[in-house]
């Protein structure tokens, strides 16, 4: 018989010892630097990142703690006009609550119209005023109280204005555009959220302390205040949208200015005068940034206090010192430097 060779027993292959997986080093989550709120002109520039939050927080708290005290409203809309925004009481009540200690008109008449209703608006305005009141109002508006809100060439009405009669009746003449201007990034919010309504109504609060005094703060203060108030009132519960509007509102002309330009704008602007080398729109968009800084330091009521002071025949410079505690000549370069830096950051 053949000899059977034994089957060799295989040598076991040693199991490799697993290499331990190194424990990953945790990447620390970056800690956002806390926003420090400005408290004075002395630290306004250093704490400029906190300006928006300070102004918004102070004002939001006022609105939430206050009640609406606005007077009666008569809102008249042209027969062929459909407004972009039709909840008039809401923005009005928010402006009222932002200024709880301030007087408001006992009655406001609002006339809203598209270009197609131009003649209707003229007739309606005449029917609501005495002949003397209409003449005075039309004279104040260069004979174009109604037509002045519209552009004849494009047959479109985008303007609005507020006036107060000698008897204290508040009038808001409000052109309604045929369509929202898609080339203007602010149009959707301005015409569709209640901002325009808040803006014009605030002008009526400005007028009350200076009725009969024939004095006005600088144009940038007047319109910058209304531009800031419209944003604050509508967005008192939405800080993100408040910030977004600030950014897009100033993304054009004001973003291209140098610090020296801003100083010149503030130095040369007067009651109803804007230096000819500056776009009049700066009285609104850029100037709302100055106003925001002032509110961040001293609160929203100061915007009317300036008018109250000037109603006593004080100059803007005197009223500013009484309200904000420093000379206007001292505050001006600080505001210019601060706002310029925030626009560039």
Question: Whereabouts are the PLM-identified features?
Answer:
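Short, functional N-terminal and low-complexity linear motifs
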Residues: 53-63, 192-198, 254-259, 271-273, ...
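Surface-exposed helix-capping loop/turn segments at secondary-structure junctions
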Residues: 98-106, 211, 299-303
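Zinc-dependent metallopeptidase catalytic helix centered on the HExxH motif
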Residues: 151-254
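Acidic/His/Gly-enriched intrinsically disordered linker/tail segments
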Residues: 212-287, 297, 307-345
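Ser/Thr-rich, Proline-interspersed low-complexity disordered segments
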Residues: 1-39, 335, 341-345
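Non-catalytic architectural context of zinc metalloproteases
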Residues: 28-186, 190, 194-195, 273, ...
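Stable alpha-helical elements in mature extracytoplasmic
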Residues: 84-91, 95, 193, 197, ...
């Amino acid at each position: 018989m053949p000899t059977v060779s034994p089957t060799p027993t295989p040598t076991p292959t040693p199991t490799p010892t697993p290499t331990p997986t190194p424990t990953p080093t945790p990447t620390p989550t970056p800690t956002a630097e806390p926003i420090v709120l400005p408290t004075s002109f002395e630290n306004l520039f250093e704490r400029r990142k906190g300006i928006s939050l300070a102004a918004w927080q102070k004002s939001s708290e006022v609105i939430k703690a206050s009640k609406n005290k606005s007077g009666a409203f008569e809102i008249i809309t042209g027969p062929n006009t459909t407004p972009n925004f039709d909840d008039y009481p809401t923005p009005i009540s928010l402006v009222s609550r932002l200024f709880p200690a301030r007087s408001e008109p006992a009655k406001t008449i609002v006339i809203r119209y598209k270009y197609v209703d131009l003649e209707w608006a003229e007739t309606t305005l005449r029917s609501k005023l005495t002949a003397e009141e209409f003449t005075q109002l039309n004279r104040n508006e260069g004979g174009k109280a109604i037509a002045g809100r519209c552009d004849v060439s494009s047959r479109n009405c985008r303007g609005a204005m507020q006036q107060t009669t000698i008897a204290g009746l508040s009038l808001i003449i409000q052109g309604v555009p045929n369509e929202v201007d898609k080339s203007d990034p602010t149009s959707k919010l301005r015409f569709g959220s209640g901002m325009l309504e808040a803006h014009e109504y605030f002008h009526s609060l400005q007028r009350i302390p200076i009725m009969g005094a024939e004095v006005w703060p600088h144009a940038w203060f007047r319109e910058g205040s209304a531009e800031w108030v419209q944003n604050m009132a509508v967005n008192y519960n939405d800080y993100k949208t408040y910030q977004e509007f600030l950014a897009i509102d100033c993304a054009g002309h004001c973003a291209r200015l140098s610090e020296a330009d801003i100083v010149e704008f503030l130095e040369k602007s007067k009651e109803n005068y804007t230096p000819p080398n500056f776009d009049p729109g700066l009285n609104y968009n850029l100037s709302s940034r100055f106003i925001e800084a002032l509110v961040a330091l001293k609160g929203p009521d100061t915007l009317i206090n300036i008018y109250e002071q000037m109603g006593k025949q004080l100059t803007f410079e005197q009223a500013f010192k009484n309200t904000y505690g420093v000379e206007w000549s001292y505050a001006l370069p600080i505001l210019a430097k601060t706002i310029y830096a925030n626009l560039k950051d």
